[in-house]
Amino acid sequence: ATAYNRGQILYRIAEMLEGRADQFESEIALTSQITSAKAKALVSEAIDRWVWYAGWSDKLQAVSGATNPVSGPFFNFSISEPQGVVAIASSDSFLEFIDAIAAAVVSGNTSVVLVPGSLAVPSMSFAEVLATSDLPAGVINILTGSLDELAPWAASHMDIDGFDISGIAKKKQGALKEAGAENLKRIHSFGSGKTPARILAFMESKTVWHSVGV
């Protein structure tokens, strides 16, 4: 899909999530033990996050790409590309769950999302949203269970290129980084909040040389 089409799909996810806002509010209030008012504000912010990330889809090259200065009769360009398959260890916050997924897929990555049991119900409802949002099959894959069991598997998996371990306690992150070192897996942890740095963390730069006048 083109960058523009990815943005359209992410925006469609926001629309479908908004259409089921009442369901998510009740599920989050129940599973997270928060008030209905707080759950409503959280779902509203989650919808806004999808729209925010959707807007980045066709602007990433303008921000991260470059024409590099060279001393010769040729051009040199740096172009950002998606890394590939990104695993995500989600925290039990629905908003952080959304942030991690949107940041990974907006650039064109596919994702394997590891979700703790405390967020299982909202995450499975969100999988239903994805199924009706024109998202190609296999782009976002959600697994629920114990992160203590799932995260080491993801860290050592040779076909996973990046790993967002924001949902893992800091004292356990070192072991995951060691496990991911064998295939040079790019492993990052982020704080809460939206930032383009989270998108760029799972992109790679390709440098292209081209002769002038050819």
What are these regions (language model features)?
Residues 111-114, 141-143, 162-164:
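Short hydrophobic alpha-helical runs that function as membrane-insertion/retention elements
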Residues 6, 108, 140, 154:
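Residue-level signal for inorganic ion chemistry
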Residues 1-75, 103, 116-117:
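N-terminal Rossmann-like NAD(P)+-binding subdomain of aldehyde/semialdehyde dehydrogenases
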